[in-house]
């Protein structure tokens, strides 16, 4: 993390052994002299297992963004850097990342993190690439929708993809629509551009 100078959390060699496989879903625990906490929308610290914004502090933390005082004030509060990433800490202090705060989908009053849905879809070996996002919806506020690229020779249909999700995530997190495309829009670094995905979805509706 650039704003923190280097890493904030890590998994030790022992935590990578077979008996501790569940830890591999986390990004580890804070390194020496660093602290991590999770804050809810009310600014109060969340209980273990409760999702909120990840805030961090440590000796390598930046002083400010160069000549950007307003941007600095938004993220540097009371000696803590607000990452705008969402996640939770378990009872043992391991950090799990749910996704970016700005990417969170609010559908029917429920908070849904695209990364969780994307990870389920990636479990299907016939899906090569996936992007999940919220699309404005008059009834739900936002509708969970997904765009996927299938592997060569796959004949998966959108409905089969939705069916695959059942039992793996809550029903309200299952994409209401799935689009099968030849490719996903990407930026110059090869990262999926969700703004372009959303634009293309709107054009198809």
Predicted segments, located by residue:
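Bulky hydrophobic/aromatic packing residues
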Residues: 1, 49, 139-140, 194
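Conserved AMP-binding/adenylate-forming
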Residues: 2-95, 101-104, 117-118, 127, ...
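AMP-binding/adenylate-forming catalytic core of the ANL superfamily
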Residues: 58, 63-64, 74, 86-173, ...
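Acidic/polar alpha-helix N-cap and adjacent early helical turns
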Residues: 199-205
């Amino acid at each position: 993390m650039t704003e923190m100078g280097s890493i904030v959390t890590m998994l030790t060699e022992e935590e990578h052994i077979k008996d501790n496989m569940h830890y591999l879903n986390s990004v580890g625990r804070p390194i020496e002299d660093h602290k991590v906490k999770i804050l809810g929308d009310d600014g109060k610290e969340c209980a273990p297992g409760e999702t909120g914004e990840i805030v961090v502090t440590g000796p390598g933390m930046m002083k400010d963004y160069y000549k950007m005082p307003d941007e600095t004030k938004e993220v540097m509060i009371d000696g803590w850097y607000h990452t705008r990433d969402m996640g939770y800490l378990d009872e043992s202090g391991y950090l799990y990342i749910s996704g970016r705060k700005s990417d969170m989908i609010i559908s029917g009053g429920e908070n849904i993190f695209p990364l969780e849905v994307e990870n389920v879809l990636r479990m299907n070996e016939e899906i090569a690439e996936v992007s999940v996002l919220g699309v404005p919806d008059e009834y739900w506020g936002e509708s969970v929708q997904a765009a996927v690229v299938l592997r060569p020779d796959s004949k998966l249909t959108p409905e089969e993809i939705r069916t695959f999700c059942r039992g793996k995530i809550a029903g309200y997190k299952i994409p209401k629509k799935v689009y099968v495309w030849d490719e996903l829009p990407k930026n110059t670094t090869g990262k999926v551009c969700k703004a372009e995905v959303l634009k293309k979805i709107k054009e198809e509706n």
